Regions:
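Periplasmic-binding protein-like
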Residues: 121, 136, 197-201, 207-208, ...
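Bacterial N-terminal signal peptides
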Residues: 10-21
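Short, polar/charged alpha-helical segment
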Residues: 31-64, 140
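Mature extracytoplasmic/periplasmic domains
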Residues: 257, 262-319
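Extracytoplasmic ligand-binding site segments that recognize negatively charged/polar headgroups
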Residues: 41-48, 68-71, 86-222
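Extracellular/periplasmic bilobal clamshell ligand-binding domains
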Residues: 304-341
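A ligand-binding cleft/hinge motif common to bilobed small-molecule-binding domains
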Residues: 97-101, 219, 224-242, 291
């Protein structure tokens, strides 16, 4: 009888140990702590929203941020790589193609998050080096006071219509990550190609530093229509500003902006915990609150978005992220020649 009781205790103890291994650190394990530096292009208002949440959930982790546009972050990383190391533990920028380049160069840590199974499968790197963390949708924005319903552009090519001459704008792909991948995608598209940008140039397109600058000029009336992210329009509309958004029928650009852990991180445990948080429902709610679609199909759409991301994907512009990752300078040089000079 005593032997049976001892066996029972051993089985229970083994089960508890197994459960602890599956669900998290074993009882008595040291809490994850230390500094985590995140390089990101995510909006400052989302960072400010996240700071108290992260502090409450992870009191022993000092989460620090370097904020800048995607191209600014990439420039910083390249400079740090040349010096031999980077201060970044995690990166979150809006250029999926760049993560392919980092993966090829051995700069990312392989990590299969337990939250990967909740994401759209094609937005998780098949080898586990990164995954989407937020969605950006590039489409067409317009000033409701300047554009009548009958004149609304329906396709990307409509931006080249002479009636918008001098009144159409776009963010600069040399400075903005979302503008770069949108430009690269359209340039590779058989329906568009570089002839689309040649047509925009003939229509006196205004090239602004970023999406925020395009939004500002649309609201001031300097522009009537333009290439802009859905999240800019949703946020502006929530504040009562007269902006509308159109998903071009010839393919909105859907950008699964990723998150990845740098291979050189000195705090893998903390970096993984923060990575997991961003892919959790709580972390993704902050993304949705920031007017962007979630990478999880079980999350709601941003407030007042006309379509769910699963529906936008059905007619989105096809994107070859691997090919785009191999020709960033070629795309930027071509755009510079056609549009900026």
């Amino acid at each position: 009888m005593k032997s049976i009781r001892l066996k029972g205790i051993a089985i229970v103890a083994g089960t508890l140990l197994l459960l602890g291994t599956i669900s998290g650190p074993a009882l008595g394990a040291e809490p994850v702590k230390g500094k985590v530096m995140i390089y990101t292009s995510i909006y400052l208002h989302i960072i400010e929203q996240l700071k108290p949440t992260l502090k409450q959930k992870f009191p022993n982790i000092d989460v620090q941020w370097f904020y800048g546009g995607s191209e600014k972050v990439i420039t910083k990383l390249v400079a740090e790589f040349e010096q031999g190391n980077t201060m970044a533990d995690l990166i979150m920028i809006a250029d999926p193609a760049y993560y392919n380049a980092l993966k090829r160069d051995g700069k990312l840590l392989q990590y299969r998050s337990p939250n990967h199974k909740y994401l759209f499968p094609d937005w998780v790197d098949k080898d586990g080096y990164y995954s989407g963390v937020r969605m950006n949708i590039m489409g067409i924005a317009y000033n409701k006071k300047l554009v009548a319903a009958k004149d609304l552009p329906k396709t990307w090519w409509d931006l080249a219509n002479p009636k918008w001459r001098g009144k159409v704008g776009m963010p600069n792909p040399l400075l903005s990550g979302t503008a770069f991948v949108s430009t690269a995608g359209l340039a590779r598209s058989p329906k568009h190609g570089w002839r689309f940008f040649e047509a925009l140039r003939k229509n006196n397109v205004t090239c602004e530093p970023g999406n925020g600058a395009v939004e500002t000029k649309l609201l001031s009336g300097q522009l009537a229509v333009g290439m802009l992210l859905e999240e800019n329009v949703l946020k502006a509309a929530s504040e009562g500003k007269p902006l509308g958004f159109i998903y071009p029928s010839d393919g909105p650009v859907v950008i699964p902006a990723p998150i990845g852990i740098m291979k050189t991180t000195k705090n893998q445990a903390a970096a993984k915990v923060i990575y997991d948080f961003f892919l959790s429902k709580e972390g993704q709610q902050a993304i949705v609150n920031g007017w962007m679609p979630s990478v999880r199909p079980d999350m709601p759409a941003p407030k007042n978005a006309a379509l769910m991301i699963k529906d936008v994907r059905k007619f989105a512009l096809p994107m070859d992220w691997e090919a785009i990752s191999r020709e960033p300078e070629k795309v930027k040089e071509k755009f510079d020649q056609i549009v900026l000079h």
